[in-house]
Amino acid sequence: DHDHDHDHDHDEIEHAWFVPEKVSEVAKEIEQRAGGSASEVTKRMDAVSERLGQLDHVHLAMTEPIAAGLLYGTELDDVTPEQYARSTLNHTDPSIDAIAAFIEVIEQGSLDFLVVNPQSTNSATQRLIDAANDNNVPIIEITETPPAGTNFLDYIEEVTDTIERVVAAAEPKDHAA
């Protein structure tokens, strides 16, 4: 057993619109300033948080931390190598060593899925996608904005649906902590 209360500050998350609590806070702020009701947004974001909170312990990695706000505080354990994650947060190209460490994580067989933002790819990302495909690691694509014609809340729920399906299909693995 290990601690899943990853010490991440949601104020520092780059893609804050993927933090259900932040979305609810913004909706309430808009309600106070402009009227209307935040209840539908709050209800839907609470449901997303609850659904993600009920998922089994699995390991994931992200080519960039697009889904961090959805996943932190859940049993979904982000095993992205720290050096790689740091480079993406700093908007720098990952080193050869960081890419190699990430590929090793994929090839070890304990990764349940890989999160990719198809709007932000490069040769390193493609190598990771290729490694995931070669090792039968499911890939979840999450974009920064909903597809054309899709409501934001619907999109967050669709992403949650996809994560639930992939986690449910994950085969038990030896997740050495």
Labelled PLM ranges:
Residues 1-177:
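Extracytoplasmic metal-acquisition and chelation regions
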